[in-house]
From Swiss-Prot:
Main subcellular localisation: cytoplasm
Residue positions binding Mg(2+) 2: 225, 227, 230
Positions of Mg(2+) 1 binding: 16, 18, 213
Origin organism lineage: Eukaryota, Fungi, Dikarya, Ascomycota, Saccharomycotina
The protein's name: Phosphomannomutase
Any GO BP annotation: protein N-linked glycosylation
Positions that bind alpha-D-mannose 1-phosphate: 25, 127, 138, 145, 183, 185
Presence of keyword Isomerase: yes
Subcellular location: Cytoplasm
Quaternary assembly: Homodimer.
Functional summary from the UniProt entry: Involved in the synthesis of the GDP-mannose and dolichol-phosphate-mannose required for a number of critical mannosyl transfer reactions.
PANTHER family recorded: PHOSPHOMANNOMUTASE (PTHR10466:SF0)
CDD domains with a match to the protein in the record: HAD_PMM
GO molecular function, one term: phosphomannomutase activity
């Protein structure tokens, strides 16, 4: 057993990052760090996010691989256990360049034809296990992200674009998952956040808790939140996460 030092080594608590451990794209608070330190003495902890590890380091700190027992970047396609890297998967190897080029050409053409209040840079971000598509671009400032999120709720830009992609590529075997404030992920069906659970099977956890803020249908926490292997906790903010952790695990 890898976690014999814990009070309850058969319980794993997994967290989404944006909106759950940190405000969207911002850094972790001292209060959250202290809460997680207390929690880690009792149980096994990990995070699972769609971003790559470099962005998770920006948000959760440079010692992230040591601060969590499990670190799952890109939904677990890149994975670490106790600081050691586990086997990884590649989106481009799975889809192939021919299909990938068709997908990207359609996305860029679609984005050029829609009316948006602003455009910045990095509309398609290529990652190891997925692509991330942002109509206004990932280089938007925090204020621009907040403004766009309100605009998107009114005009359903991402939702409409996802439907257009599903219609254009019905046989590509892709899932489209809206997450964060300004973007959505595109990845092979089955490579959602439940993908990370295969990395923890060898520990035979009796309880796996998951905390996430996008647990509604179409949100990028939906599949793992509703998976029969997990106990789902829907949160509205990092403060909400701390409150539920204190109540559930008696941390105070």
């Amino acid at each position: 057993m890898s976690f014999a030092n814990k009070q309850d080594p058969k319980t794993l608590v997994l967290f989404d990052v944006d909106g759950t451990l940190t405000p969207a794209r911002l850094t972790i608070s001292e209060e959250m760090k202290k809460t997680l330190e207390k929690l880690r003495e009792k149980v096994v902890i990990g995070f699972v996010g769609g971003s790559d590890l470099s962005k998770q380091v920006e948000q959760l700190g440079p010692n992230v691989l040591n601060d969590f027992d499990y670190c799952f970047s890109e939904n677990g396609l890149t994975a670490y256990k106790l600081g050691k890297e586990l086997a990884s998967q590649s989106f481009i190897n799975w889809i192939g360049n021919e299909k990938y080029n068709k997908l990207v050409k359609f996305i860029l053409r679609y984005l050029s034809d829609i009316d948006l209040p602003i455009r910045r840079g990095t509309f398609i971000e290529f990652r190891n296990g997925m692509i991330n598509v942002s109509p206004i671009g990932r280089n938007a400032s925090t204020q621009e992200r907040n403004d766009y999120e309100k605009f998107d709720k009114q005009h359903h830009i991402r939702e409409t674009m996802v439907e257009a992609l599903k219609k254009e590529f019905p046989d590509f075997g892709l899932t489209y998952s809206i997450g964060g404030q300004i973007s959505f992920d595109v990845f092979p069906t089955g490579w959602d956040k439940t993908y990370c659970l295969q990395h923890v099977e060898d520990e035979h956890f009796e309880n796996i808790h998951f905390f996430g803020d996008k647990s509604y249908k179409g949100g990028n926490d939906y599949e793992i939140y509703n998976d029969p292997r997990t106990i789902g906790h829907a949160v509205n903010s990092p403060d909400d996460t701390i409150r539920i952790l204190n109540e559930t695990f008696k941390l105070q």
